[in-house]
Amino acid sequence: MNRKVVACLSVLLIVVLTSCGGEKTSESNRVVVGIPADVNTFNPLFAFTVDEGAITELLYLSLADFQWNAEQGELEAYPMLAKSWEWAKDSSSITFHLRDDVKWSDGVPLTANDVVFSLDVYSDPVVDSRLFGIFEDLYTDKENHIDVAKSFVVKSDYELQINFKPHSSPDLVDIVHPVIPKHIFERYKRKDLETAKDNFNPVTSGMFVLKKWDRNQTITLGVNKNSFLYKPDKISELVFKVIPDYTSRLTQMKKGEIDLMELIKTEDINDLKNNVNVMLKTIEGREYEYIGWNNIDPKTYEEKKEFAPNKLFGDKETRIALTYAINRQEILEDYLYNYGELAATPISPIFKSAYDQNIKQYEYNPDKAKKILTDEGWSDSNNNGIIDKNGVEFEFTLTIPSGNPLRPYEATIIKNNLKAIGIEVNIATLEMGTMMDDIIARKQDSWIAAWYIPIPIELKSYWYSDLQNTPLNFVGYQNKTADKLMDKLKIHLPKERQKKLYYQFQEIIHEDQPVTFMYWISDIVGINKRIKNINITPLGAITHCWEWSVK
């Protein structure tokens, strides 16, 4: 599977993943976070999972950091390694002024040369980092490797100018990433960086340092008292405890053996609400569930590598009928206990300036679904209970991944809903990796999955018509008008102009219905009430931990 695709898939789906109990955390100044799996690295170059990303960003700082402005529904940048920055009037460059008091944990000063080295390595195809291919606004070669001479001007140890290509649309979020120490990693050949021993005994710049790692047990981060972020009244230790079994994590949460866990199941909410030591928060608007309809014919693609309309899902009216026929609200209420909301497009309600709240949902209406299908020429010509058209019966396989109890629940309701309008659905369960391989190869008819969306909004990777170069467009959606809108949205525009383009895109994708957008699912987070100053936002739960304190 393509490495870049794997990086995106690492945040694709909620999969509910045992460990014995330990001492209670309530009498210490440390915080214990329960996680379902161990990490594979402490190097941000290769932090492909959500937990790896969260931990490495505590160890390695970036030029700037971001916080979520809930009122505006957008990111706000604030200084971190850089104390300030300014853009050229034409956005052709940005100049960063770095702090001069930051040292790596081995005592070596952090300078602009570390920043240049980091971006160079991130973009190196030999390294194949999690960020490879995203630096299109900088000067790069044919392999997307940054041209260091053209892109960077190191004016001093603490002043760096970054230059951008003409007609590009640079954004701060595209160039601000965890900085790694040049003096440590320049000793390795680039091809050997992923297995470098210093990935596991890291020299870091953040408020935290790796204190101890017991593989598949615990990751212990201690505070870096030399960090400019250090405050003596905040937490002294942050422990990530590996507990693969969900029930065991939940039990330890209730007993106070861990202080925080994410992905709490809705059926456990009432029990936790009755626990005097636990408070519940939600991360909203980052993940939507969807039913993928393969818009292209899998047989034609497999045999000829050509894109022909799918015989069942190739026209938008049929896809709209399918959405009308599925009772999404029932699943949202009965399984998710309304911890979420119905989805209409891939743009989340958290993006207040971009989200079009006037888009009308395709609410459950099987009669309307039947009428649309009849108008499209579908009928039960042989009275066998399955509608057909031109000799093709409307029967398909709906594939779901193993390991998440929500998926078979959804699939059963979908099967029954579609049966009621004359469509036969066969449910197949596959291991996640196998299912994704088939989807990427465009072999599946239909599937249930979820996207964990990036911030800021990214549409082109998922919906652009160039299917050869857009591997995350799993359903094979193609619309040239939508393409033009996505191209324009890559350019810096006034907010009102940008808002108009987002609205137009939502109208198009809602009318085309390339997938059935099911609902936005809230990630329910359990937190021990002894933790103070913790701020749960769409950016996640494990952020800005240097601000946490313990009562």
Question: Residue locations for each model-derived region?
Answer:
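Surface-exposed binding/hinge segments that line
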Residues: E86, H97, G133-R187
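N-terminal lobe/hinge region of extracytoplasmic solute-binding protein
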Residues: I35-K89, V203-T204
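Long beta-strand-rich cores associated with HINT superfamily self-processing modules
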Residues: I527-K551
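Acidic-aromatic pocket-rim loops
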Residues: E284-K304, P408, T434-I491, H544-E547
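Extracytoplasmic/peripheral linker and loop segments enriched in polar/acidic and small residues
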Residues: S92, V153, K311, K316-I320, ...
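Gly/Pro-rich hinge or "lid" segments in bacterial periplasmic/extracellular proteins
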Residues: Q67-Q72, D174-D233, E237, Y355, ...
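Ligand-site clamp/hinge motif
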Residues: L193-N199, N226-D271, K415, E424-N426, ...
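Append "and occasionally in soluble cytosolic enzymes with long acidic Gly/Pro-rich linkers
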Residues: T220-G222, L229, N310-N416, Q504
